[in-house]
Amino acid sequence: MSKTSTKGIWKVISASSMGTMIEWYDFYIFGSLAVVISTKFFPSDNPTAAFLSTLATFAAGFVVRPFGALFFGRLGDIIGRKYTFMATLLLMGGSTFLIGCIPSYESIGFLAPLLVLILRLLQGLALGGEYGGAATYVAEHAPAGEKGYWTSWIQTTATVGLFISLMVILATKSVLSPEAFDLWGWRVPFWVSIAMVGVSYLIRKNMDESPVFAKAKKEGTTSTNPLKESFGNRYNLKFVLLALFGATMGQGVVWYTGQFYAMSFMKTVMNVDSSQVDELLGIALLIGTPFFIVFGWLSDKIGRKYIMMFGMLFAILSYRPIYKAMYNTTDISQKIEIAENPRKTTEKKADGSSVTTIQKKYTDGTTVMEKKTYMEKKDVQTSVSIQITPNDKWALIFLVFIQVLFVTMVYGPIAAFLVEMFPTKIRYTSMSLPYHVGNGIFGGLLPAISTYFVSHAKTAGKADFYLDGLWYPIIIAGICFVIGMIYIDNKNKITHL
């Protein structure tokens, strides 16, 4: 590859990656603020139900992603890659900004969660069209034999988008008081996205169409009905189903377990301080992100199949030991409380409620803050926040990093794997659907399903209740591993590119 072509593809990578990263930021800022959002847009009389409702709304955005894949995939195979993922960028950015403008449940009642749900669905539709367009656009610019390496840069954007969402939240919290952030500051990360979208739109606007698609359009070989050709043709449908059940289904649950469920688990099951979770997760993501490129590059050398399959296998075998070790870092029953009276304060609120805060310290440096809110004619609401020690923080960073490493193994090569399975004229449509079903349905529902399993097991009195949420990703990844090992060919198919 010449110097000019190297410069050209870096321009393509930059434009595609920046836009896709912003869309992931927009999509995941909702999940990163799920604990706060549950208190703003849903009834506050049952915090657990409100949090589960927030996760369900978060999951709704994933459920519609396949529909976005079909709509925008068809559009991308007919009018082109460039203009399609420009449209998805604007739809995502506008929806995210408006979520930050919705009045609270206390102000407009059930209209608040309804508006959030509608905008969340629009976010899901937009993301359903974005990833396939960006991955296809980059792959169709990349030279033969290097598609794993170049498309792996797109694979970093989901993790980088999550990382930036955490950093924006931390930055906002650092300049505002806890009261101000809880009152209105949580809206700032949603508003910030509109500026980033504007910059990315201008960059994408000046990009050329994919040379492979432009050539096909000039020769008149583009599809007039990509949906029919993708799913009505038994030969193509076979590869769509193989991509889903032999790759993206397992990749989806590994991705969301290693990043989003890990975050949710630390905040809601382990009760680690929210800012500490954002910080340690951000560090683990920062350390792990380069491995997307490593495994994408390696897949060009040895094939995609075994890297992805072994990533799933390692995750299946390791999840329960990893999460048991995570839980034990904040298990108060294994720590020694300092023998002195806990600090106790009570604060009266203007609405007639009162908040009692009890602070306990332990010999290893752990601090536990327990807040009891006494509402008039309502049950007592209890929340616990644990400030972990530096040693425990680095232990958790390591345990999350291991999970991120599994993510990079299954996710780094998958864009190249998918685009190589389908011909140019139906590529956008054919690769988008299995990707977004695997990630949107199987992966996106994971936080809500796993949290429900944990909550149910805890209510049932199981000693290791906190591990029950892992059965879902273990089973799904296990099924995918078996199908992938049997039916996927390790030879990278490049005949379509």
Over which residues does each language-model region extend?
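Cytoplasmic membrane-interface "Motif A"-like loop-to-helix N-cap segments
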Residues: 78-90, 301-312
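Extracellular/periplasmic helix-loop-helix junction of adjacent transmembrane segments
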Residues: 34-67
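Glycine-rich segments within core transmembrane alpha-helices of 12-TM secondary carriers
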Residues: 126, 148-173, 196, 322, ...
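Extracytoplasmic gate region of multi-pass secondary transporters
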Residues: 30-31, 236-285, 322-323, 355-359, ...
